[in-house]
Amino acid sequence: MKKGTVLNSDISSVISRLGHTDTLVVCDAGLPIPKSTTRIDMALTQGVPSFMQVLGVVTNEMQVEAVIIAEEIKQHNPQLHETLLTHLEQLQKHQGNTIEIRYTTHEQFKQQTAGSQAVIRSGECSPYANIILCAGVTF
């Protein structure tokens, strides 16, 4: 369910069409995107825009009730993992709900992206900078 404004028309459109429990992926520059899934490519060059910049814009617009993250981020990108957890804590406070955090293997994560409404690709070039956002409702 859409809750704000965003300039990118593709992102705005996909968020406005999300129903309860639909999913949307924000990923790094290297995640393979299934051909059957809508790709919204924001990457300009390495690191631009960053994963957290894209995620911040998307979560400002989207009501989130759960997220799925690859377990490997804890070991291979601990700094981003901590930044991500802090962002999710702040988002919970802003939205007034609890966001369930689910971990899975990176292989299972890649398989789950096929069921998403879209994959938004950032320019991030650090390992496991990927998240599946599960849409909530604002009421």
From Swiss-Prot:
Organism domain of life: Bacteria
Keywords for this protein: Carbohydrate metabolism, Cytoplasm, Isomerase
Protein name: D-ribose pyranase
Enzyme Commission number, as recorded: 5.4.99.62
GO biological process: D-ribose catabolic process
Short name of one Pfam family: RbsD_FucU
Family in the record: Belongs to the RbsD / FucU family. RbsD subfamily.
Function: Catalyzes the interconversion of beta-pyran and beta-furan forms of D-ribose.
GO cellular component, one term: cytosol
Localization: Cytoplasm
HAMAP family: D_rib_pyranase
Main location: cytoplasm
Residues engaged in binding substrate: D28, H106, Y128, A129, N130
Lineage of the species this protein comes from: Bacteria, Pseudomonadati, Pseudomonadota, Gammaproteobacteria, Enterobacterales
Matches recorded under InterPro entries: D-ribose_pyranase, RbsD-like_sf, RbsD_FucU
Active site: H20
Key word Isomerase present: yes
Metabolic or biological pathway: Carbohydrate metabolism; D-ribose degradation; D-ribose 5-phosphate from beta-D-ribopyranose: step 1/2
Subunit structure: Homodecamer.
GO terms assigned for molecular function: D-ribose pyranase activity; intramolecular lyase activity; monosaccharide binding
Organism per entry: Escherichia coli O1:K1 / APEC
Substrates-to-products reaction catalysed: beta-D-ribopyranose = beta-D-ribofuranose
